[in-house]
């Protein structure tokens, strides 16, 4: 039985469209961090309120990922993905129309639901479009769109000189998804692997059986812990890196360039580490990845000036963002096709708890008067916990259809 899309044009179309959606998702996810200093001045936000604004969108990602993954196994990856893209496109434009802090928070929560619903389907479609031996590379190629979308957000932020022009970032981030919806409807093929198992008993399994039955309990828990801890670090950096760099004395242009370095490193890291996972022993790749995260965070905390901060941010992006792409690839191979959407969606949802905790923890430390290096260094112990969980995960047997 074919478990992947065999035709090369269909593979290329699937991966290209998934990359484009990830690019737009990355643009939206990092738009708040880029626009935050200007939004804070317009709405008169305190540090605590900025933390709430950061976490609002990521809070919506949790139910979105769980629901999007479950529906992917029931009604198909393509349908759920199109609905999710339309939702976050409309609500990104609504973000630009926000006239108060309360409205901003509500709109960002709803935007997060759309963003969260898209990711499990992007992972499933990318991993199922290629043979099993290439799944990590395919997921990484898709996921590198996230940091490259962040590069676009950073460049837009640098180009917009006025404090009142932050809304344009969200107009761009909303128009792109809405223009892409009809393209997806016409060109995106449904996963062949999903069509082969749709309606089977496995596809109708309960959520509890999908996650914990069939010997999957330990793999599920290890995935959840590694996702949760890694996303604490990732979303702390995504949301607070511009403000922390500004607090270190960098001007707006240099802050934007540090953010660009972080995202470019992330895109290259996703491609490189994903390809390595398909070709090398997983324990070496994962161990090296987490060692790189720890060392780059230490360098980012200690860097004295712009050049060293940019270099450290590049390395941090390479290992943190690249590492998250590896975790997404691992989730795709530890659940069988009929259950992949639910399993990946649950892991993404639990990880999103970390994406809420990370910005809020940074907010708490900064509000208590802690310096930027101390806040960055505080994420290193969390990284070590994620490393242990991920190394335990790869000792588990992979799923078989």
Please tell me what each predicted stretch does:
Residues 44, 76, 97-103, 131, ...:
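Helix-breaking motifs and short loop linkers at transmembrane-helix boundaries and internal kinks
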Residues 33, 215-270:
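Extracytoplasmic gate region of multi-pass secondary transporters
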Residues 63-101:
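Conserved MFS/SLC helix-loop-helix module at the cytosolic interface between two early adjacent transmembrane helices
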Residues 107-144:
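Cytoplasmic helix-loop-helix junction between adjacent transmembrane helices
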Residues 74-84, 279-290:
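Cytoplasmic membrane-interface "Motif A"-like loop-to-helix N-cap segments
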Residues 142-186:
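Helix-loop-helix hairpin linking two adjacent transmembrane segments in secondary transporters
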Residues 87, 91, 102-110, 307-315:
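Paired small-residue
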Residues 1-27:
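Cytosolic juxtamembrane N-terminal segment immediately preceding the first transmembrane helix
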């Amino acid at each position: 039985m074919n478990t992947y899309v065999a035709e090369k044009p269909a593979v290329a179309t699937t991966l290209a469209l998934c990359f484009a959606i990830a690019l737009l998702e990355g643009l939206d996810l990092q738009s708040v961090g880029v626009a935050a200093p200007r939004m804070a001045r317009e709405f008169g936000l305190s540090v605590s309120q900025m933390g709430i604004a950061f976490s609002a969108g990521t809070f919506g990602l949790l139910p979105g990922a769980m629901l999007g993954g479950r529906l992917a196994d029931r009604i198909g990856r393509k349908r759920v993905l199109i609905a999710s893209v339309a939702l976050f496109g409309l609500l990104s434009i609504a973000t630009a129309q926000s006239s108060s802090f309360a409205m901003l928070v509500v709109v960002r929560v709803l935007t997060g639901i759309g963003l969260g619903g898209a990711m499990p389907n992007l992972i499933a479609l990318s991993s199922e479009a290629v043979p099993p031996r290439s799944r990590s590379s395919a997921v990484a190629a898709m996921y590198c769109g996230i940091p490259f979308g962040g590069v676009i957000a950073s460049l837009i932020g640098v180009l917009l000189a006025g404090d009142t022009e932050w809304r344009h970032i969200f107009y761009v981030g909303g128009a792109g998804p809405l223009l892409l919806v009809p393209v997806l409807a016409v060109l995106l093929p449904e996963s062949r692997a999903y069509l082969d198992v749709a309606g089977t008993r496995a596809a109708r399994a309960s959520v509890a059986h999908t996650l914990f039955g069939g010997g999957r309990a330990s793999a599920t828990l290890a995935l959840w812990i590694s996702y949760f801890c890694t996303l604490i670090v990732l979303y702390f950096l995504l949301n607070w890196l511009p403000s922390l760099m500004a607090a270190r004395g960098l001007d707006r242009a240099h802050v934007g360039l540090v953010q660009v370095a972080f995202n470019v490193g992330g895109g290259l890291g996703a491609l490189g580490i994903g390809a390595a996972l398909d070709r090398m022993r997983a324990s070496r790749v994962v161990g090296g990845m987490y060692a790189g995260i720890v060392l780059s965070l230490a360098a980012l905390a200690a860097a004295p000036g712009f050049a060293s901060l940019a270099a450290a941010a590049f390395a941090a992006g390479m290992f943190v963002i690249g590492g998250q792409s590896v975790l997404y690839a691992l989730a795709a191979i530890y659940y069988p096709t009929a259950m992949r959407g639910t399993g990946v969606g649950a892991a993404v949802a639990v990880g999103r708890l970390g994406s809420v905790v990370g910005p809020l923890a940074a907010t708490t430390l900064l509000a208590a008067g802690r310096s930027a290096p101390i806040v960055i260094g505080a994420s290193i112990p969390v990284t070590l916990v994620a490393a242990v969980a991920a190394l335990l995960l790869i000792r588990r047997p992979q799923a078989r259809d």
